[in-house]
């Protein structure tokens, strides 16, 4: 901005001193004429020339990095539990990514989900064995945070995927989709499935402390505050710990305890499959519907017969691939894990860059909706 300078002209009045001669009978003294005061030289006021200074941009555009990896060493994958079709599909993507970016992946996790502390020994073992990176889906965000922090202190790159821990305990969190969007989708599926968006609904979740499921359920509850969902009544939230037998038992209990139940919403692929099997076996198709997050191959038959009118999920293989690529980028030093960094992972996201956002999070993309119109094609195209 240019400064405006005001000019002031300096005016100086010159006063002439006149000597008067006085007549007197006494001798008149001789008075030397007064010397006129000199006229001061006033320097002209000069308006300075102000050169505008270009404003620096708020932030310099960071270079977009294409991750190449080329790493060696061990990368340990720690899902919530083993034998889970969802994480098995993710591990397919991880193995595929290892051929592109280097490193040797392996899985180590509890046999059963639901225990907040069960992952800690696996994190500690990977740290002791000097793994280059660990990929963790948190069963409990708080319980494992100290073990993750200790791993970072030993130089292990910590990548969370699917379910997050506490900020500061990891390098990057690879989130499968926007949390608010998933919650909104669950609420909308319940509304679409319940008769005229009215009636009793219940939630069958994974573990009570599961970070991602709890966040989605909270987002669903927030969405349902809208008057559009006023006719829906949430009567229960139960937990199957992502174990088929536990989830089946919980679905049976829900139906027995709530004879007017219209929809079971399950934000877990294990739970949604178990609930669909229970509804089908009890011949309640058309009376109790099941919606939630499910894999296309497992849910195809239940979508086609009307047990589960629609479910949604992201490409779990791509989720695993992206998580491993991020780990490789951190190990190689191609990315640092700072907010604002942009990078490209070849073969996914259409070549568009991912940007690290708040809490060091990146998002895989939008979920896929599976229904009668598209389930056959998705089940054919997607190997999970």
Where are the predicted features?
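Bacterial N-terminal signal peptides that target proteins for export
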Residues: 1-12
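A residue-level marker of the well-folded mature domains of exported/periplasmic proteins
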Residues: 4, 23-384
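C-terminal motif of bacterial Sec signal peptides marking the signal peptidase cleavage site
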Residues: 18-21
């Amino acid at each position: 901005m240019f400064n405006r300078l005001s000019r002031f002209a300096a005016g100086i009045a010159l006063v002439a001193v006149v000597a008067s001669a006085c007549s007197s009978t006494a001798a008149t003294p001789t008075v030397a004429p007064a010397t006129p005061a000199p006229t001061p030289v006033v320097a002209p006021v000069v308006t300075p020339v102000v050169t505008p200074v270009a404003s620096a941009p708020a932030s310099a555009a960071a270079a977009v990095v294409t991750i190449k990896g080329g790493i060696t060493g061990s990368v340990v994958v720690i899902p919530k539990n083993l034998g889970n079709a969802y994480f098995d599909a993710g591990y397919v993507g991880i193995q595929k990514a290892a051929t592109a970016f280097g490193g040797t992946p392996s899985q180590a996790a509890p046999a059963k989900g639901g225990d907040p502390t069960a992952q800690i020994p696996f994190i500690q073992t990977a740290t002791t064995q000097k793994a280059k990176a660990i990929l963790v889906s948190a069963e409990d965000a708080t319980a494992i945070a100290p073990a993750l922090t200790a791993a970072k202190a030993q130089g292990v790159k910590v990548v969370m995927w699917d379910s997050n821990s506490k900020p500061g305990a990891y390098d990057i969190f690879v989130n499968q989709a926007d949390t608010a969007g998933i919650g909104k989708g669950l609420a909308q599926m319940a509304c679409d499935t319940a008769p005229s968006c009215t009636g009793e609904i219940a939630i069958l979740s994974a573990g009570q402390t599961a970070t991602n499921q709890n966040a989605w359920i909270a987002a669903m509850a927030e969405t349902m505050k809208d008057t559009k969902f006023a006719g829906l009544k949430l009567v229960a939230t139960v937990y199957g710990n992502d174990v088929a037998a536990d989830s089946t038992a919980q679905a049976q209990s829900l139906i027995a305890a709530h004879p007017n139940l219209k929809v079971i919403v399950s934000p877990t692929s294990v739970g949604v499959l178990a609930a669909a099997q229970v509804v089908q076996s009890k011949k309640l198709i058309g009376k109790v519907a099941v919606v939630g997050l499910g894999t296309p191959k497992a849910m195809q038959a239940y979508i086609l017969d009307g047990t589960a009118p629609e479910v949604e999920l992201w490409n779990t293989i791509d989720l695993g691939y992206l998580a491993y690529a991020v780990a490789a980028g951190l190990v190689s030093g191609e990315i640092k894990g700072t907010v604002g960094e942009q990078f490209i992972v070849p073969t996914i996201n259409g070549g568009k860059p991912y940007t690290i956002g708040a809490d060091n999070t990146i998002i895989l993309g939008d979920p896929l909706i599976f229904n009668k119109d598209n389930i056959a094609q998705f089940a054919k195209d997607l190997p999970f």
